[in-house]
Curated annotation (Swiss-Prot):
Subcellular location(s) of the protein: Cytoplasm
Known role: Involved in peptide bond synthesis. Stimulates efficient translation and peptide-bond synthesis on native or reconstituted 70S ribosomes in vitro. Probably functions indirectly by altering the affinity of the ribosome for aminoacyl-tRNA, thus increasing their reactivity as acceptors for peptidyl transferase.
Keyword Cytoplasm attributed: yes
UniProt pathway annotation: Protein biosynthesis; polypeptide chain elongation
UniProt GO molecular function: translation elongation factor activity
KW Protein biosynthesis (keyword) present: yes
Protein name: Elongation factor P
PANTHER family named among the record's database cross-references: ELONGATION FACTOR P, TRANSLATION ELONGATION FACTOR KOW-LIKE DOMAIN-CONTAINING PROTEIN
InterPro entries: Elong-fact-P_C, NA-bd_OB-fold, Rib_uL2_dom2, Transl_elong_fac_P/YeiP, Transl_elong_KOW-like, Transl_elong_P/YeiP_cen, Transl_elong_P/YeiP_CS, Transl_elongation_fac_P
GO cellular component, one term: cytoplasm
């Protein structure tokens, strides 16, 4: 699907020079005093990971990749891959672990994830917005430390370290955002 350069947004996946590029930063729309308006776009190649700044005229049209999104259930790890199952067809697919990068520790058994496909090839895996995890290591509670909003480091059951409020103890379950690895609330 063709979109105008003015319609490009962060997160869009574009087909440019026969490669897939994700827009990594909000495009800058510029209208100089002399000459035509243009859009400065910072994008990252999905295959190689290289970043590139490109300038497009406001009148340019680019190909936006049409992605298909499906829900899959995480089953298990196999060598360097993640094995997922489509809950409608029970078809299993194997995807390289690198697709998740630093979010890999948040993947838990039977978790439902969204997989984005381009030309029937998996491009990305989107985890749920939040996960519930147990604190396995943190400093003890200090009496009177709840007067100010201060945070202390805590290690979660998956090995990830996050900052949590002073009043939380080892063994408590908390809700964590998978997007930026931040504490949300105590689990209910």
């Amino acid at each position: 699907m063709k979109i105008s350069a003015n319609s490009i947004r962060t997160g869009n996946i574009l087909v440019y020079n026969n490669d897939l590029w994700v827009v990594s930063k909000q495009p800058e729309h510029t209208q100089p005093g002399k000459g035509g308006a243009y859009v400065q776009v910072e994008m990252k190649n999905l295959k190689t990971g290289t970043k590139r700044n490109e300038r497009f005229s406001s009148s340019d049209h680019l190909e936006k990749a049409e992605l298909e999104q499906k829900d899959y259930q995480f089953l298990y790890f196999e060598d360097n891959n993640i094995v997922l199952m489509d809950n409608q067809t029970f078809e299993q697919i194997s995807v390289n672990k690198e697709i998740l990068d630093e979010k890999l520790p948040f993947l838990t058994e039977n978790m439902i994830v969204k997989v984005e496909f381009y030309n029937e090839k998996p491009l990305s895996i989107e985890l749920p917005a939040t996960v519930i995890l147990e604190i396995i290591e943190t400093d003890p509670v200090i009496k009177g430390a709840t007067a100010t909003a201060s945070y202390k480091p805590a290690t979660l059951a998956n090995g990830v370290k996050v900052k949590v409020p002073q009043y939380l103890e080892i063994g408590e379950k908390i809700v964590v955002k998978t997007e930026d690895l931040t504490y949300v609330e105590r689990s209910k």
